[in-house]
C-alpha cells in the first residue's frame, strides 16, 4: 500500500547536505547517519537539481506530469537504483496517491524518502534528509535557492591523504598529485565560502578516531539528539546488500563490496598520515604551499609554508577547473530533453533498459 503523506508533515522535514570530495569517508558518514531513526541519507543522485528546470513551475500535477517525472528520474539516475531505490511501480503509485498535495519541493522529498526499502529503513519517524552529492559543491548557489533553509556538513580529509587514497583507487581522469590537490582545493574553496553559521566542518580523522564526538557534533548541528545506534556499523552494509542480492548481478555485488571495503571493516586510523610513505618532499612542499590557506582553516599541521611550484601547479589547477566546475556547469545548462537523449544513447551502448 502506498504511503499517503500530509502536506504539513512533508513541509516539516528538513533537507540538509553533505559536501565533500571523493575518498573523504562520506559513505561511512552516510551509513552512520542512516542508523539514526530520524535521518535518511540517500544514495547520491542529483535529480533535485537536474529536474528542477522542467518541473518546478508545475502547480497542479497531473497523472501525465507524474509519469514524466518518474521516467526522467530513472533515466537520469547515476547510481544503481536496484540497490538503493524502491521499485519503480511502487514509487509511481506513491506519487499518484499524493498527487493533490504535490509541489516540486514535496515531490523531491517523497523521492528522497523512497531510497531504501521500508523494511530496511523505517521512514515514519524521519525528520531530516541529509543528501550527499559531490556535484552540488559546484552548484551551491542553485542548491541554496532550492533549499534556502539547508545546512551543510563539510566533510574534509587532509589533502595529502586524500591524494594517496584517490591514487590507490585510481579515481579521476588525471592521477597526478598536483591535479588531485587542485581538485581538493577547488572544492573546499567553494565550501568554506559558505556562512559559518550555516556549515559544520567534520574531519575524516575525527570520524575515524573519535566517531561519537564527531556524530554528536553533527546531530547537534542538525538539531537532533545523538543516537548511540549510529556507532553500530559492523555488518550493516553487508546485510543490506545481502537483502537486495536477488535484484543484483553477482559480479556487480562482488565489485560493490570490494569498493566499499572501508565501511565493512573496523574503523582504522592507520590510513591517517599514510601520505608520508607515498609523497616526496618536493611534492609535499608544493601541495602544502598551494593548499595552505584551506588546510590552516581546518587545522591541519603543515611541514612547510613556503609557496613554490606556482606555475606548475597553476597548470593542474586549470585542468582541474575544466574537469570539474566547467564540465558540470556545461552539463547543467544542457536542456533536459538533450540530457535524456544523451543518457538513452549511453544506456543503449551499455545495454541498460530505458
What are these regions (language model features)?
Residues 13-14, 24, 135-138, 186, ...:
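Short, conserved clusters of charged catalytic residues that mark active-site
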Residues 1-17, 115, 120-123, 192, ...:
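PAPS-dependent sulfotransferases, especially Golgi type II membrane carbohydrate sulfotransferases
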Residues 117-231, 236-262:
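PAPS-dependent sulfotransferase catalytic domain
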Residues 21:
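P-loop (Walker A) phosphate-binding loop of NTP-binding proteins
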Residues 40-43, 200:
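Conserved catalytic segments around the Walker B and adjacent sensor/switch elements
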Residues 27-39:
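A conserved segment at the C-terminal end of the G1
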Residues 35, 41, 47, 161, ...:
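Active-site micro-motifs of SAM-dependent methyltransferase domains
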Residues 42-131, 136:
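PAPS-dependent sulfation machinery
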Amino acid at each position: 500500500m502506498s504511503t499517503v503523506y500530509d502536506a504539513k508533515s512533508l513541509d516539516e522535514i528538513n533537507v540538509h547536505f553533505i559536501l565533500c570530495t571523493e575518498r573523504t569517508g562520506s559513505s561511512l558518514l552516510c551509513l552512520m547517519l542512516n542508523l539514526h531513526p530520524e535521518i535518511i541519507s540517500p544514495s547520491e543522485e542529483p535529480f533535485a537539481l537536474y529536474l528542477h528546470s522542467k518541473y518546478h513551475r508545475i502547480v497542479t500535477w497531473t497523472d501525465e506530469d507524474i509519469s514524466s517525472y518518474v521516467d526522467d528520474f530513472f533515466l537520469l539516475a547515476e547510481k544503481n537504483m536496484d540497490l538503493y531505490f524502491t521499485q519503480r511501480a511502487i514509487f509511481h503509485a506513491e506519487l499518484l496517491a499524493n498527487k493533490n498535495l504535490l509541489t516540486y519541493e514535496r515531490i523531491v522529498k517523497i523521492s528522497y524518502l523512497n531510497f531504501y526499502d521500508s523494511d530496511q529503513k523505517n521512514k515514519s519517524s524521519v525528520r531530516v534528509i541529509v543528501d550527499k552529492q559531490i556535484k552540488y559543491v559546484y552548484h551551491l548557489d542553485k542548491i541554496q535557492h532550492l533549499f534556502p533553509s539547508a545546512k551543510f556538513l563539510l566533510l574534509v580529509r587532509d589533502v595529502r591523504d586524500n591524494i594517496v587514497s584517490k591514487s590507490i583507487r585510481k579515481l579521476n581522469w588525471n592521477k597526478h598529485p598536483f591535479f588531485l590537490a587542485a581538485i581538493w582545493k577547488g572544492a573546499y574553496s567553494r565550501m568554506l565560502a559558505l556562512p559559518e553559521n550555516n556549515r559544520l566542518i567534520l574531519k575524516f580523522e575525527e570520524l575515524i578516531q573519535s566517531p561519537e564526538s564527531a556524530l554528536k557534533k553533527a546531530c547537534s548541528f542538525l538539531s537532533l539528539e545523538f543516537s548511540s545506534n549510529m556507532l553500530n556499523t559492523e555488518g550493516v552494509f553487508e546485510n543490506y546488500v545481502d537483502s537486495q542480492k536477488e535484484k543484483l548481478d553477482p559480479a556487480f555485488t562482488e565489485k560493490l563490496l570490494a569498493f566499499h571495503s572501508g565501511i565493512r571493516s573496523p574503523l582504522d586510523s592507520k590510513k591517517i598520515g599514510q601520505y608520508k610513505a607515498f609523497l616526496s618532499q618536493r611534492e609535499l612542499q608544493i601541495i602544502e604551499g598551494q593548499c595552505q590557506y584551506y588546510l590552516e582553516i581546518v587545522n591541519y599541521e603543515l611541514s612547510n609554508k613556503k609557496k613554490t611550484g606556482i606555475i606548475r601547479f597553476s597548470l593542474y589547477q586549470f585542468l582541474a577547473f575544466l574537469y570539474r566546475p566547467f564540465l558540470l556547469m556545461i552539463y547543467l545548462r544542457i536542456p533536459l530533453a538533450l540530457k535524456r537523449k544523451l543518457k538513452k544513447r549511453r544506456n543503449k551502448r551499455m545495454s541498460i533498459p530505458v
